[in-house]
UniProtKB/Swiss-Prot annotation:
The keyword Transmembrane applies. One of its GO terms (molecular function) is proton channel activity. It comes from Capra hircus. This is ATP synthase F(0) complex subunit a. One of its GO terms (biological process) is proton transmembrane transport. It is a multi-pass membrane protein. The chain crosses the membrane at residues 9-29, 68-88, 97-117, 138-158, 184-204. Keywords: ATP synthesis, CF(0), Hydrogen ion transport, Ion transport, Membrane, Mitochondrion, Mitochondrion inner membrane, Transmembrane, Transmembrane helix, Transport.
């Protein structure tokens, strides 16, 4: 069956019902519950990675910011595992959907901004009026700063969506070219297959890095408001 280039990005359905919820919950099965933890190499590696990321992201925060540690660590695990599972053949990657990424970015961004206005009202309002600004430029700067503030969650979501989607499209195109060249030019097909393997390895790195960058930017937004 011939598939469209964007078939893998279509939300899967069963009996007329979307399966996105089940797909989103699936990564949680990869992490053992606390009563079944075994001190093996995999668990030790997960704990080391979580401690390293927590130290890098949360060391800049004060006590109020530290309360977000569990949420941010859960966020990076969820996005990272979802991105990596999406590299499996004939799988669906929820992070290629802008609506889902906006659903993650907007509440986290709004929570950080509301925290800032509650705890540091004057400092938060001061971001709209940089010190030393000439009086005629004040209205324009307030508008620009307001727009830049509301663009932050959109930038978070679009960045994650665009990078993951672009990687999947490249794999799809090169994989299709490899199959087409198999009967025409085996040597060229072998070269494209090697490129496909390298690109897949790069996609594993990209999926992990995008999860880190998304969570890090949320952490920085939180730092600016606590």
């Amino acid at each position: 069956m011939n598939e469209n280039l964007f078939t893998s990005f279509i939300t899967p359905m069963m009996l007329g019902l979307p399966l996105v919820t089940l797909i989103i919950l699936f990564p949680s099965l990869l992490f053992p519950s606390s009563n079944r933890l075994i001190n093996n190499r995999l668990v030790s590696l997960q704990q080391w990675a979580l401690q390293l990321m927590s130290k890098q992201m949360m060391s800049i925060h004060n006590t109020k910011g530290q309360t977000w540690t569990l949420m941010l660590m859960s966020l990076i695990l969820f996005i990272g595992s979802t991105n990596l599972l999406g590299l499996l053949p004939h799988s669906f990657t929820p992070t290629t959907q802008l609506s889902m990424n906006l659903g993650m970015a907007i509440p986290l961004w709004a929570g950080a901004v509301i925290t800032g206005f509650r705890n540091k009202t004057k400092a938060s309002l001061a971001h709209f009026y940089p010190q030393g600004t000439p009086t005629p430029l004040i209205p324009m700067l307030v508008i620009i700063e307001t727009i830049s503030l509301f663009i932050q969650p959109m930038a978070l979501a679009v960045r994650l969506t665009a990078n993951i989607t672009a990687g999947h499209l490249l794999i799809h195109l090169i994989g299709g070219a490899t199959l087409a060249l198999t009967s025409i030019s085996p040597t060229t097909a072998l070269i494209t297959f090697i490129i496909l393997i390298l690109l897949t390895i790069l996609e594993f790195e990209l999926g992990t890095r995008e999860a880190y960058v998304f969570t890090l930017l949320v952490s920085l937004y939180l730092h600016d408001n606590t």
